[in-house]
Structures are given as C-alpha cells and as structure tokens.
C-alpha cells in the first residue's frame, strides 16, 4: 500500500532553479492509478505540460515530463520528487530534475499541494 496518494491533488510551484520553466503561476493537476501517477500542468511560461511517473512505496515519484513553453518549444526532462507531509496535512514535493532537451542542465524545485 502506498504511503502517499496523489490522486486529484493540485500543486503549485513555490521555488525553482533559474534554468527551470515552472513558476508560482504553474498549476499541476495530479491523477493516480495504482502506482502510476500522471498530471497535466499549465501556467506562467508553460502553455501545456504532461508528466508520467511511478510512485514507490515511500511516495517518491520517478517521472518523465514534456511541455510546450510560451516560445512554442517542446521541452522534455526527468524528475525525482520526494514527498514531505506538512503540519497542515498537505504534501510538499522536493524535486530534482534534468532537462533531456535544450542545454541538458539540472535543477531543483519545490511544489506545494493547494
């Protein structure tokens, strides 16, 4: 049984590395079936994005993502998200990601459940 269930949860970016494209205007809508998690996201410099990943028994997500930015570019990457349960019971994800397109740089971000 999974310790964390992401189904029907909404997240927003609260911090991101300078080389990232998500911002506080970016909203993620998560769904989960078994240990498969997926989400649509949009807002800020992202017209539309999609992620697909697997959730471990500890709630960590290993995912791939692709998105279209406001410049009309398709950007892709990989991400590991580690959950933290906040005092209010909501989930915070600590993310380590890397572009698989563009400059292939790495970054870190934090997204909070709304």
Predicted regions, residues:
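Mid-chain, well-packed structural core segment of small domains
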Residues: 55-91
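Ligand-binding pocket scaffold of soluble enzyme catalytic domains
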Residues: 38, 64, 93, 107-109, ...
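Tryptophan-anchored aromatic micro-motifs
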Residues: 2-22, 91-99
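N-terminal glycine/threonine-rich, aromatic-flanked beta-hairpin/loop signature
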Residues: 27-54
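Short, solvent-exposed coil/turn segments at beta-strand boundaries
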Residues: 5-6, 30-36, 55-59, 85-90, ...
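A short, polar/proline- and glycine-enriched secondary-structure boundary/capping micro-motif
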Residues: 48-52, 72-78, 102-108
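Edge beta-strand at a domain terminus
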Residues: 24-27, 98-114
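Short beta-strand segments that buttress and anchor functional surface loops
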Residues: 12-16, 38-43, 63-68, 95-99
């Amino acid at each position: 049984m999974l310790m964390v269930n992401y189904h029907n949860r909404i997240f927003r970016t609260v911090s991101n590395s300078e080389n990232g494209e998500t911002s506080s205007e970016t909203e993620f809508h998560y769904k989960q079936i078994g240990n498969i998690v997926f989400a649509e996201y949009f807002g800020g410099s992202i017209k539309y994005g999609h992620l697909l990943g697997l959730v471990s028994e500890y709630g960590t997500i290993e995912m791939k993502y692709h998105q279209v930015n406001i410049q009309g570019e398709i950007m892709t990457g990989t991400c590991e998200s580690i959950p933290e349960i906040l005092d209010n019971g909501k989930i915070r994800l600590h993310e380590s990601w890397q572009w698989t397109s563009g400059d292939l740089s790495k970054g870190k971000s934090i997204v909070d459940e709304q």
